[in-house]
Curated annotation (Swiss-Prot):
This is Ribulose bisphosphate carboxylase large chain. The gene is rbcL. The disulfide bond which can form in the large chain dimeric partners within the hexadecamer appears to be associated with oxidative stress and protein turnover. RuBisCO catalyzes two reactions: the carboxylation of D-ribulose 1,5-bisphosphate, the primary event in carbon dioxide fixation, as well as the oxidative fragmentation of the pentose substrate in the photorespiration process. Both reactions occur simultaneously and in competition at the same active site. It comes from Fouquieria splendens (Ocotillo). Keywords: Calvin cycle, Carbon dioxide fixation, Chloroplast, Disulfide bond, Lyase, Magnesium, Metal-binding, Monooxygenase, Oxidoreductase, Photorespiration, Photosynthesis, Plastid. The active site is at K141 (proton acceptor), H260 (proton acceptor).
C-alpha cells in the first residue's frame, strides 16, 4: 500500500475519527452516498483505509490521520494520477477546516514503475569529472531584461571565474527581450569558451519550460544539438506530466535535468494546509530530475535545519528510517532509484560557505546569484571568491577542522591570499536574514 500522513483540522463539532474516516474514501473509492454500482465491484479491495489517528502535540484540534491506499488505485509510473487521487477533491471537504499532506510512503512495488532521475548523482559526477566537493552555481541576474548577448557574457564571466554551473532564472522562458533560441546559442558559446580557458567541464541550466509539452521538447532537442550538458524545468508550474516526459527525453539523450520548484510555497508553506515539500520532493524523485532546489537553512528563503535535511536525505539516500524529529513519518526504501542533488540557493554569500558545506555535504549544489554577481569587482571576481571560499572550506573539513565553530576564521585565512574573496567578505559582512522559519514540527 501507499501510506499517507494527513494533518487534519476538523470543523467544530466533528470528531477526529469522523474526519479521518472521511478523508480515506473521498481520496479513493467513495462518494457522498451509496450508489447501486458499488455492488459491481469489491470495494473492500480498493478503498482507502484510515488506520490510525493521533493528536498533534502543542496544537489544538489538529490530528495526524494515517491512510493506506491499495496500489491498484494508481496508474503505474504516473505522479499525476497518484496526486489526483490522494490530494484531489478531498481538500475541499466541508467537514474539514484544513488539511495538509505531511508525508507519503511509496512502496518499492510502485516506485519501481518510475524511471526516476535521468542520471543521478554518481553519473553526473562522472560526466563532469568533479569529485569530493559540492558543485558551485550562480543564477544570472537581473533575472529579466538582459539581451541574449549580454546574458551570455555574464554566463562566460561566471564560468571562467571558477563556477561549475550558471542558471536561467525560473522566469526566463522566451520573452520579447530575449528569445529562447538566441539565449541558448550565446550560452553555448559561453560554455565552450570557458571550458577551453579553464580545462573544466562547465554547464548552464537552459530553461526548457514552455507553454506546451511539444515546445518544451523542441527546446530540449536544440540544447542537445548544441552539445550542452544540462537543461532545466519548472516542475510545478510546468506540471508533472511534462516533467516526466522531459526526464525520459533527458535520459535517452544524455542531458542532465535541473529542476526549479517555483510555486512550491503556495502549496507547502502553511503549516496546517496544503502539502509538505518532502512530499513534492519524493514526487520529483519519481517523476525525474537530477537537481532540485531545497532551501538553504541560512539564506533568505524558508527552511528549518532538521526538516530541510530530512527531505534532502530523502532526495539523496537509498534508504531512510522513520524519524519524526526531522518530519519523516515513514521509513522509505528507494531500492535502486537514482538520487537527486539538492540545490541550496537564495540569499547566500561567502560568509555562509562554511555552514553550507557542513550542512549539505559534498553531494549538493551551492548556488550564489547575488552572492556572485554582486561582487564589487564584477562577475568573474565574484565567481573566484566563491570558488576560493569553497576550496578553503573543503580543505579545512578534510583536515578535521570544525566548520561550524571555525568557519569565519577559515574564510578570513583564505581571504589573506585571495583579494577577490577579501573584497567579497567586506561587502557582505553585515548581510543576514534572521527570520523565524514557518516550517517547524
Amino acid at each position: 500500500d501507499i501510506l499517507a500522513a494527513f494533518r487534519v483540522t476538523p470543523q467544530p463539532g466533528v470528531p477526529p475519527e469522523e474526519a479521518g474516516a472521511a478523508v480515506a474514501p473521498e481520496s479513493s473509492t467513495g462518494t457522498w452516498t451509496t450508489v447501486w454500482t458499488d455492488g459491481l465491484t469489491s470495494l473492500d479491495r480498493y478503498k482507502g483505509r484510515c488506520y490510525h489517528i493521533e493528536p498533534v502535540a502543542g496544537e489544538e484540534n489538529q490530528y495526524i490521520a494515517y491512510v493506506a491506499y491499495p496500489l491498484d488505485l494508481f496508474e503505474e509510473g504516473s505522479v499525476t494520477n497518484m496526486f489526483t487521487s490522494i490530494v484531489g477533491n478531498v481538500f475541499g471537504f466541508k467537514a474539514l477546516r484544513a488539511l495538509r499532506l505531511e508525508d507519503l510512503r511509496i512502496p518499492p512495488a510502485y516506485s519501481k514503475t518510475f524511471q526516476g532521475p535521468p542520471h543521478g548523482i554518481q553519473v553526473e559526477r562522472d560526466k563532469l569529472n568533479k569529485y569530493g566537493r559540492p558543485l558551485l552555481g550562480c543564477t544570472i541576474k537581473p533575472k529579466l531584461g538582459l539581451s541574449a548577448k549580454n546574458y551570455g557574457r555574464a554566463v562566460y564571466e561566471c564560468l571562467r571565474g571558477g563556477l561549475d554551473f550558471t542558471k536561467d532564472d525560473e522566469n526566463v522562458n522566451s520573452q520579447p527581450f530575449m528569445r529562447w533560441r538566441d539565449r541558448f546559442l550565446f550560452c553555448a558559446e559561453a560554455i565552450y569558451k570557458a571550458q577551453a580557458e579553464t580545462g573544466e567541464i562547465k554547464g548552464h541550466y537552459l530553461n526548457a519550460t514552455a507553454g506546451t509539452c511539444e515546445e518544451m521538447i523542441k527546446r530540449a532537442v536544440f540544447a542537445r544539438e548544441l552539445g550542452v550538458p544540462i537543461v532545466m524545468h519548472d516542475y510545478l508550474t510546468g506540471g508533472f506530466t511534462a516533467n516526466t516526459s522531459l526526464a525520459h527525453y533527458c535520459r535517452d539523450n544524455g542531458l542532465l535535468l535541473h529542476i526549479h520548484r517555483a510555486m512550491h510555497a503556495v502549496i507547502d508553506r502553511q503549516k496546517n494546509r496544503g502539502m509538505h515539500f518532502r512530499v513534492l520532493a519524493k514526487a520529483l524523485r519519481m517523476s525525474g530530475g537530477d537537481h532540485i532546489h531545497a532551501g538553504t537553512v541560512v539564506g533568505k528563503l524558508e527552511g528549518e535545519r532538521d526538516i530541510t535535511l530530512g527531505f534532502v536525505d530523502l532526495l539523496r539516500d537509498d534508504f531512510l528510517e522513520k524519524d519524526r524529529s526531522r518530519g519523516i513519518y515513514f521509513t522509505q526504501d528507494w531500492v535502486s532509484l537514482p538520487g537527486v542533488l539538492p540545490v541550496a540557493s537564495g540569499g547566500i554569500h561567502v560568509w555562509h560557505m562554511p555552514a553550507l558545506t557542513e550542512i549539505f555535504g559534498d553531494d549538493s549544489v551551492l548556488q550564489f546569484g547575488g552572492g556572485t554577481l554582486g561582487h564589487p569587482w564584477g562577475n568573474a571576481p565574484g565567481a573566484v571568491a566563491n570558488r576560493v571560499a569553497l576550496e578553503a572550506c573543503v580543505q579545512a573539513r578534510n583536515e578535521g577542522r570544525d566548520l561550524a565553530r571555525e568557519g569565519n576564521e577559515i574564510i578570513r585565512e583564505a581571504s589573506k591570499w585571495s583579494p577577490e574573496l577579501a573584497a567579497a567578505c567586506e561587502v557582505w559582512k553585515e548581510i543576514k536574514f534572521e527570520f523565524e522559519a514557518m516550517d517547524t514540527l
